[in-house]
Amino acid sequence: MTDKVIENNQVIIMGKIVSDFEFSHEIFGEGFYMVDVEVARLSDSYDIIPLMVSERLLDVEEDYKGAYVCVSGQFRSYNRHEERKNRLILSVFAREIEFVEELEESSKTTQIYLDGYICKEPVYRKTPLGREIADVLLAVNRPYGKSDYIPCICWGRNARFAGGFNVGERCEIWGRIQSREYMKKIGEDQLEKRIAYEVSVSKLELVEE
């Protein structure tokens, strides 16, 4: 059962550690820490992806900034309560970490596979420049009755396809994790820069159950 659940949420990221470790929480005496990994895109830009690491995987007292890593794990979410609202916080939960000398130009720096359920009516729209986009929120089951809620963004014909999905349908998604900056209105006239994380979908299929 547990192995099957782990198979439905698989992530590989390759990139450079660019921050110190910051304590997140402790479970049964095991400490978990957050660290940022810079992951290159195909263009010249990059994404900063938050990584959650157990103190049993890495020495969290060490300074690893500048080190290249290959991480396999899962894309996880949890709700943080702030400003009388719940905010969805996303990070890659590391299961294995391997240090690498450097990253090859051709290597895929982030890959993700999800098998979950549509938990919100997909929103299909066109941008002012005519690009077709659909937003999909996927609930991916975890052991012990928990679920991760993963925002996914589809483009072009994938967006048209996803626009017809119904809540409760099972869907497989392949793609990459990306970050996106946006401005959040705080109070009447104040804006705060925030970063959202989502899966940019390259392929998706409905699963007949």
Residue positions per predicted region:
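OB-fold and OB-like single-stranded nucleic-acid-recognition modules
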Residues: 1-209
